[in-house]
């Protein structure tokens, strides 16, 4: 191969590498944002669950309060 062909191939590889580095950085930022959003949503879900448990007693009777089925 001639020198110019090697230069061209090297330029192409450098260009691809730069693009890949940029893409990886963007993906990393997206993953970090998603992790923060998931943490926020988990905390919100925990708070809502606690609020729901405190606001309304369970509508399901405990085992001792249930009447036995008719076949007993």
From Swiss-Prot:
Any Pfam family from its record, for instance, is SlyX
Supply the InterPro entries for this chain: SlyX (IPR007236)
Q: Which segment of the chain is annotated as a signal peptide?
A: none
Domain of life of the organism encoding this protein: Bacteria
Q: Which PANTHER family match?
A: PROTEIN SLYX
NCBIfam families referenced in this protein's UniProt entry, alphabetically: PRK02793.1 (NF002750)
Name this polypeptide is given: Protein SlyX
Q: Which organism is it from?
A: Erwinia tasmaniensis (strain DSM 17950 / CFBP 7177 / CIP 109463 / NCPPB 4357 / Et1/99)
